[in-house]
């Protein structure tokens, strides 16, 4: 498929989770399929007929084992990214050129020992909590702009 044909592919509908601990640090995981030292927040696709909040809660639990959370907000707008050329046609069965995501801000109500990244279909090798300002510095290139927007919004939002 030529690059022009990829431009006609739709964006995949997805959700992202900004999970905050009691210190307002953000949960990030190191992806299993990426050998470089890059991290991401939990995220994933929306199943047919699924509500966005349900999808976010499901994805969070599938990727981290976490289910003790409270949704405290949303990032204002839908955020989009395009896949880099080397990933086009290789992920999501080649059906999408990127993602359009609704991001939810959640407070983690559990304890660190409850976090389990060794799930049925693991996505992360490791995890840690980071300051929101660190997000753009640890993301893959094609997600840096999204992580900058999220970090900026977190810095201007009162989180309770």
Regions found by a protein language model. Give the residues of each.
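Acidic, metal-coordinating catalytic segment for phosphate/diphosphate chemistry
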Residues: 1-20, 93-94
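A conserved beta-turn-beta hairpin within the catalytic core of GNAT-like acetyltransferases
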Residues: 34-37
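A short gly/proline-enriched turn/hairpin at secondary-structure junctions
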Residues: 40-41
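Unchanged
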Residues: 47-141
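Charged phosphate-binding loop/patch that engages nucleotide di/tri-phosphates or the phosphate backbone
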Residues: 132-160
């Amino acid at each position: 498929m030529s690059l022009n044909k990829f431009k006609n592919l739709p964006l995949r509908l997805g959700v992202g989770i900004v999970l905050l601990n009691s210190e307002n640090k953000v949960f990030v995981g190191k992806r299993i399929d990426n050998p470089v030292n890059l991290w991401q927040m939990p995220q994933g696709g929306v199943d047919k007929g699924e509500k966005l909040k349900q999808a976010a809660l499901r994805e969070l639990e599938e990727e981290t084992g976490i289910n003790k959370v409270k949704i405290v907000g949303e990032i204002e707008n839908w955020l989009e990214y395009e896949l880099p050329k080397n990933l086009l046609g290789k992920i999501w069965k080649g059906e999408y050129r990127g993602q359009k995501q609704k991001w939810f801000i959640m407070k983690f109500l559990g304890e660190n020992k409850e976090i389990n990244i060794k799930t049925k279909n693991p996505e992360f090798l490791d995890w840690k909590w980071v300051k929101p300002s660190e997000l753009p510095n640890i993301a893959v290139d094609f997600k840096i702009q999204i992580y900058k927007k999220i970090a900026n919004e977190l810095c201007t939002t009162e989180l309770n």
